[in-house]
């Protein structure tokens, strides 16, 4: 018997689904993998029988499991199940949204529990204020943890003050500089051991005083917009 990789995957899914069905019949609460396998295997078999449409199976797939049939939190993890099933007239995608009702678990996976009080961003860190001028004809966006000293060379500002610093904004956010725009930003010291590598390779070493002089010289040589350079200082 010669089987394609896709056919082997379907057989594996069938075995997993049958195992999940037996465990459910024995009163065992299913985990994430078992729940998905049970639903998928059922849909594939019904599609192969050819007596039900895609719409029928999309609806039926939501009735196979209840929150009590799965382990706590599993229902909340399964947002949708998509199965490429073989119908008599060809392969079709059956997508089942929210196949298991979550049952209202108070501590569902991924739930965010917030404090009642406000959280101070970067508390205790001294901020440096800089005016930045975008001299380019395209917008420039800078992420929260980018070494600001090494941002786009068409942004002109006092790069010496930006050495070893990043934007004082929430992690994962960014600041956008439109063409010709002047904008004031606040920077804070980058945390950790102050070894800065990558970006535009202006530092690639410990961010100390000697490193600053060398980085400023490189920035000037490579045409980065620098105000109050100080590159020629001994």
Curated annotation (Swiss-Prot):
User: What biological process terms from GO does the record include?
Assistant: urea catabolic process
Return the protein name: Urease subunit alpha
Documented EC number(s) = 3.5.1.5
Molecular function terms in GO for this entry?
nickel cation binding; urease activity
Where does the record say this protein resides? Cytoplasm
Residue ranges of the region described as Urease gamma: 1-102
Key words of the record: Cytoplasm, Hydrolase
Pathway note: Nitrogen metabolism; urea degradation; CO(2) and NH(3) from urea (urease route): step 1/1
Membership in a protein family = In the N-terminal section; belongs to the urease gamma subunit family. In the C-terminal section; belongs to the urease beta subunit family.
Urease beta: annotated span: 103-234
The main location class comes to cytoplasm
Sorted alphabetically, the Gene Ontology cellular component annotations on this record are: urease complex
SUPFAM superfamilies, alphabetized: Urease, beta-subunit, Urease, gamma-subunit
| Quaternary structure annotation from Swiss-Prot or TrEMBL | Heterohexamer of 3 UreA (alpha) and 3 UreB (beta) subunits.
Enzyme class, top EC level, equals: hydrolase
The yes or no answer to whether the keyword Hydrolase is present is yes
Entries under Pfam families matching the protein: Urease_beta, Urease_gamma
Domain of life of the organism encoding this protein: Bacteria
Catalyzed chemical reaction(s): urea + 2 H2O + H(+) = hydrogencarbonate + 2 NH4(+)
């Amino acid at each position: 018997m010669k089987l394609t990789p896709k056919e082997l995957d379907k057989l594996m899914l069938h075995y997993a689904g049958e195992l999940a069905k037996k465990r459910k019949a024995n009163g065992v609460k299913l985990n994430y993998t078992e729940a998905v396998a049970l639903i998928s295997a059922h849909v594939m078999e019904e599609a192969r029988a050819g007596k039900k449409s895609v719409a029928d199976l999309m609806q039926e797939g939501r009735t196979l499991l209840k929150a009590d049939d799965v382990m706590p939190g599993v229902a909340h993890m399964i947002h949708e199940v998509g199965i490429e099933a073989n119908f008599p007239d060809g392969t079709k995608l059956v997508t089942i949204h929210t196949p298991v009702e979550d049952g209202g678990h108070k501590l569902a996976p991924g739930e965010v529990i917030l404090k009642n009080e406000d959280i101070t961003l970067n508390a205790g860190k001294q901020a440096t204020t800089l005016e930045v001028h975008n001299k380019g004809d395209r917008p420039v966006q800078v992420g929260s943890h980018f070494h600001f000293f090494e941002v786009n060379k068409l942004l002109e500002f006092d790069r010496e003050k930006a050495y070893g610093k990043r934007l004082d904004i929430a992690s994962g956010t960014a600041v956008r500089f439109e063409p010709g725009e002047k904008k004031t930003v606040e920077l804070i010291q980058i945390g950790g051991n102050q070894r800065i590598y990558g970006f535009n390779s202006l530092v690639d070493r410990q961010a100390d005083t000697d490193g600053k002089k060398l980085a400023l010289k490189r920035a000037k040589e490579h045409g980065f917009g620098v105000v109050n350079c100080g590159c020629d200082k001994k």
